[in-house]
Amino acid sequence: MALWRGSACAGFLALAVGCVFLLEPELPGTALRSLWSSLRLGPAPVPVGPLSPESRLAAAWDALIAQPARRWRRVAVGVNACVDVVISGVKLLQALGLSPGSGKDHAILHSRSDLEEAFLYFMGKGAAAERFFSDKETFHDIAQAASEFPGAQHYVGGNAALIGQRFAANTDLKVLLCGPIGPKLHELLDDNVFVPPESLQEEDEFHLILEYLAGEEWGPFKAPHANRFIFSHDLSNGAMNMLEVFVSSLEEFQPDLVVLSGLHMMEGQSKELQRKRLLEVVTAISDIPTGIPVHLELASMTNRELMSSIVHQQVFPAVASLGLNEQELLFLSQSASGPHSSLSSWDGVPDVGMVSDILFWILKEHGRSENRASDLTRIHFHTLVYHILATVDGHWANQLAAVAAGARVAGTQACATETIDTNRVSLRAPQEFTTSHLESGSRIVLNPDKPVVEWHREGITFHFTPVLVCKDPVRTVGLGDAISAEGLFYSEARPD
């Protein structure tokens, strides 16, 4: 009976509140909330505001990302590996007694002064770069100072090792890694990464990663984005010494995907050695059984002749897939007289239409077609604020999920979170863009609820998605490698 009276009382009180709403619609909201609370019927429901574009986009990705029907079981990765010593670039250069002068790029670093100038040049642009340091003794002194510097951190480094580490996070995958692997690197590697005994060596190869924050200043230079400058005196990786070990390991390992990187490390070698080694790379790739796709991960380069040789000396036709960023894409086009090659550098965010034109040209000129015996059918392009996956129709499946997964991992890895933290990322991709500048491209308006945009051009399909950029990145090194690995993990190669 008491229960019935309580329910009736609540009903009458609710009716009374309804009458107040009806008769006094102008009554302030605070007064109504106070009245509601005083009736002890619980707090008034707080209206839920609209979700942020970042929250909508992250939720849409999660709904889109699905496993491929046929998944990789065994992945072989080679051939560059090292220990990354990560440190504040400005603090290290100050500790070395250097002061900020004028920024200037150097294709090869010969001195501390060259290092200071090149670091400032790229810091001022907020762009990533990698250079070879020619003087062994000077590099050793700098590396020792960096390694012992307070706050210096040691990580797995080298594109192949970083890609292998990312794949190894999937425990149902078996991962083979070949490269010059010393004791420190071996200690840092995931237990799921198998290293052939022939890859082990007594000393590690060290790469110095000079990081800077967005807005960080040194002298007259201010970084527009957080990024890093990488340099090394790396002879094992530079000569691709582990290439033969890598190829000889494949027969026993029996991979269903091969990932190759490290060609950029040859920039410190003579032209004769570069030419000889590239031919050996092509021969090695040709020995991999038909039906096993090979992905080539490119990295920062300055030698146009080397890049042109990679494009033209049968390396591109021998691989099925490419991974590269905006600097490598434009440099590739400049080296091989491709579209928009008169552009000296990107002005801010790379134009989507221009990027699309260059990707189209690579696949049309060097990819598979009825008239060309090439294996190249896929390119995964990544820049800070968006990614594009371009594929020749009929050869790859699940690319919508693959491009979304690659973009998602960019946000989680940079912020060092398991999932996207929408409070720590921002949507910076262009809200509108044209898909081509060389023909009448479509006009696209970005919709966070449908974050993957697809368009087609003469038998080539493009998948575009924005990136949720980490506002306060914990670590920028290896993002491109993680992006490419994640995109490959979700990709499915269709059998010929």
UniProtKB/Swiss-Prot annotation:
What pH dependence of activity is documented? Answer: Optimum pH is 5.75-6.5 and 8.75-9.0.
Q: Detail which positions bind Mg(2+).
A: 297, 328, 481
GO biological process terms, semicolon-separated: glucose metabolic process; glycolytic process
Q: Does the keyword Secreted apply?
A: yes
Q: What class of enzyme is it?
A: transferase
Any Pfam family: ADP_PFK_GK
Q: What is its main location?
A: secreted
Query: InterPro entries attached here?
Result: ADP_PFK/GK (IPR007666), Ribokinase-like (IPR029056)
The EC number(s) attached to this protein equal: 2.7.1.147
Q: Give cofactor(s), names only.
A: Mg(2+)
Pathway this chain belongs to = Carbohydrate degradation; glycolysis
* Domain of life, per lineage: Eukaryota
Q: How is the cofactor bound?
A: Binds 1 Mg(2+) ion per subunit.
Leader sequence range is: 1-22
Cellular component, GO, one term: extracellular region
Question: What quaternary structure, including any partners, is listed in this protein's UniProt entry?
Answer: Monomer.
* Assigned protein family: Belongs to the ADP-dependent glucokinase family.
What PANTHER family does this protein's entry cite?
ADP-DEPENDENT GLUCOKINASE
* General function of this protein: Catalyzes the phosphorylation of D-glucose to D-glucose 6-phosphate using ADP as the phosphate donor. GDP and CDP can replace ADP, but with reduced efficiency.
Please give the name of this protein: ADP-dependent glucokinase
Gene label = Adpgk
